[in-house]
From Swiss-Prot:
It comes from Arabidopsis thaliana (Mouse-ear cress). The gene is DRG3. This is Developmentally-regulated G-protein 3. It comes from the Eukaryota. Belongs to the TRAFAC class OBG-HflX-like GTPase superfamily. OBG GTPase family. Binds GDP and GTP, and has low GTPase activity in vitro. SUPFAM superfamilies: P-loop containing nucleoside triphosphate hydrolases, TGS-like. Residues 291-367 form the TGS domain. Keywords: GTP-binding, Nucleotide-binding.
Length: 369
């Protein structure tokens, strides 16, 4: 592992010394590809027969409808924030793991059970194998949203460091997957086409990056001005794209003018965990970023159950998804569904499995006789 870390440092040093311009883009693209491969090797799970790797003992059972991971440096008030949120809205449970205390709490908010998970151990250099970063980030990758807790006194410094660590683990915050296609083929070399003007990538750079992965035949289509990093992300194929909120804590220690600036920044939510300022606003933002859909069930000849909604992701909210969420065998008996709500053209509307539901729709499943 020390050899891999040494190679990573050498490449990072070379990249830092290399000026970014058109003449060096080919070389930098090649270095970035080498770096991505080394980090992948570094963060790979230990092979069997190693006498018990550092990854043993860290696992948190996923519960609830969605999971939010709290990340932050020590003494930024992360634990206080977690305790205030869970203490106000639900009970908090704690579980001890090997050399690491992880405190998951579940809150019920707008009918959804949301697991808040404290992820300790995010330190500078964690992406390079220091501490227990690999184990912590493997859990972070299972989250539906990341909540980075920052100190209002030095928010930008901590923000950049944490983002760098998460980026190194293949987690992309508040980004969409690269809008490009990469199709491997048996022969014909590397072909690059684009539907827009391209300023970051040329054919030589693309060939160099593909060559590092021993790919010499592929068709690549760019639908936006993609970078070398974007191409590498697609080739690596193990990137996680998730929403992120920056909870700036201890706002009682800054001026009103500074607070107004923070409040205007995208994805930021100023709070004071100690004084319980704007915790409702933070929960609203978490709900917005999780983008969940609540569906109420209605048994035949009975009123809808508004107390215990079925929670779906906004990306998977068809009637079929709804049935699977309730029970995997429900589809075998499915005949049609009756839907009341904003997705229905009339009330009720008879629909099939492919119908897309909207938040707070009411659904009655009609089974085969």
């Amino acid at each position: 592992m020390s050899t891999i870390m040494q190679k990573i440092k050498e490449i990072e040093d070379e990249m830092a010394k290399t000026q970014k311009n058109k003449a060096t883009s080919h070389h930098l693209g090649l270095l970035k590809a080498k770096l991505a491969k080394l980090r992948r090797d570094l963060l790979a799970p230990p092979t069997k027969g190693g006498g018990g790797g550092a990854g043993e003992g860290f696992d948190v059972t996923k519960s609830g409808d969605s999971r939010v991971g709290l990340v932050g440096f020590p003494s930024v008030g992360k634990s206080t924030l977690l305790n205030k949120l869970t203490g106000t809205f639900s009970e908090v449970a704690s579980y001890e793991f090997t050399t690491l205390t992880c405190i998951p709490g579940v809150i019920t908010y707008r009918g959804a059970k949301i697991q808040l998970l404290d992820l300790p151990g995010i330190i500078e250099g964690a992406k390079d194998g220091k501490g227990r970063g690999r184990q912590v980030i493997s859990t972070a990758r299972t989250c539906n949203c990341i909540l980075i807790v920052l100190d209002a006194i030095k928010p930008i410094t901590h923000k950049r460091l944490i983002e760098k660590e998460l980026e190194g683990f293949g987690i992309r915050l508040n980004k969409e997957p690269p809008n490009l296609t990469f199709r491997k083929k048996d022969k014909g070399g590397i072909n690059l086409t684009s539907t827009v003007a391209v300023t970051h990538l040329d054919l030589d750079t693309v060939k160099a990056i593909c060559g590092e992965y021993r790919m010499h035949n592929a068709d690549i289509t760019l639908r936006y001005d993609a970078t070398a990093d974007d191409l590498i992300d697609v080739i690596e194929g193990s990137r996680i794209y998730m929403p992120c909120i920056y909870a700036v804590n201890k706002i009682d220690s800054i001026t009103l003018e500074e607070l107004e600036i923070l409040d205007k920044l995208p994805h930021y939510c100023p709070v004071s965990a100690h004084l319980e300022w704007n915790l409702d606003g933070l929960l609203d933002k978490i709900w917005e970023y999780l983008d969940l859909t609540r569906i109420y069930t209605k048994p035949k000849a009975m009123n809808p159950d508004y107390d215990d909604p079925v929670i779906l992701s906004s990306k998977k909210r068809t009637v079929e998804d709804f049935c699977i969420r309730i029970h995997k065998d429900m589809l075998k008996q499915f005949k049609y569904a009756l839907v009341w709500g904003s997705s229905a053209k009339h009330k009720p509307q008879r629909v099939g499995k492919e119908h897309e539901l909207e938040d707070e729709d009411v659904v009655q499943i009609v089974k085969k006789i």
